[in-house]
Amino acid sequence: MERGFCTAGCSALSWHTKDGKHLWGRNYDFDRLAEGTQVTFLPRGTAYAPVAGGSGETLRYACAGTGLLLPQNPVLYEGLNDQGLMGGQLYYRSFAAYPDGLDTGKRPVQPPFLLLHLLGQCATVEEAVRCL
């Protein structure tokens, strides 16, 4: 069986229920989690840097999720903020490509820190899209 360009990858799905709720789920396509991974809560005001070694930011919104609490930069694999925005990092080996330069008016964010940055700074999907 030929697998094509993608030999492994996580999946996610979301749906609206008849009673008006929004549900989201995902799988994790690795046989183990990084040592130190845990369910965590990050309160408003938690410091982080969207680029390793870069200038610091603070969370506007509290976040909870599963992740790795690196000393200066927490990483969330999936999470939810106190405004109801939720998301997850999905991994597709060799699928993503990143530009060499920075777009005018945009801030650099390294991929492992993107979910935390969006959940920590955005209250809605529309805000997250503008942030990208």
Predicted stretch roles:
Residues 1-3, 93, 104-132:
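Alpha/propeptide regions of enzymes that mature by internal proteolysis
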